[in-house]
A protein has these predicted regions:
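Juxta-kinase regulatory segment immediately upstream of eukaryotic protein kinase catalytic domains
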Residues: 1-13
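Protein kinase-like catalytic core scaffold
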Residues: 36, 70, 89, 154-156
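Short loop/turn segments at strand-loop or loop-helix junctions that form parts
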Residues: 39-42, 90-96, 157-160
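Short catalytic/ligand-binding loop motif for oxyanion handling, primarily in non-cytosolic enzymes
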Residues: 46-48, 80-86, 98-101, 147-150, ...
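Conserved kinase catalytic-core helix
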Residues: 55-69, 103-144
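Conserved structural core of kinase catalytic domains
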Residues: 68-118
């Protein structure tokens, strides 16, 4: 997959999509990663630190799912770029018209309230389920971090992994 990521990030056929938080999402239009969003982040030279970050990301994905949040298929890979290990998130793409801000603009007030209620219910359930966990866990949950499909809310923002961290 590393080769596919490198190829997609350097391909002129990969388009930048709406920026989310700290990374720059890109969507390959062709190739094996078409149908995915790639989000490349600034990395570092300390491999031990970057590998710990990758392990935390895996643990965070597990925590999100065990706590009831639905997350599209998501992986984090470290890509070596001139000695710098860059974290790259590879996530199954969600259609633009399924993103919560788009749904708010398309529906009326009652539809928006219904969407907010579904997201709030999932977020509250997340906090209820992690309340007794010993490690520090966070959830950065602005509305643009969610999409909606026929089964309910999808949480998209898995980086940085908010698990076992210090302030």
């Amino acid at each position: 997959m590393t080769g596919w990521i490198r190829a997609a990030l350097s391909d002129a056929g990969t388009i930048q999509v709406t920026q989310r938080n700290y990374g720059v999402p890109m969507r390959p239009l062709t190739g094996p990663l078409a149908g995915h969003v790639l989000i490349a982040f600034r990395g570092g030279r300390d491999l031990d630190v970057q590998e710990a970050l990758a392990r935390r990301h895996d643990a965070y994905l597990d925590c999100l799912r065990l706590a009831g949040l639905r997350v599209p298929d998501t992986q984090m890979r470290l890509i070596d770029h001139a000695g710098v290990q860059r974290p790259v998130i590879v996530q199954s793409a969600v259609p633009d018209d399924a993103m919560l801000p788009h749904l708010f603009r398309q529906g009326g007030t009652q539809a928006a309230i219904g969407l907010l209620d579904r997201v709030a219910t999932d977020v509250a359930e997340f906090w209820r389920r992690i309340a007794q966990r010993p490690e520090r866990i966070g959830l950065y949950s602005p509305l643009d971090s969610f999409a909606m499909d026929e089964d309910g809310p999808l949480f998209l923002d898995t980086f940085p992994p908010l698990i076992s961290y210090n302030r």
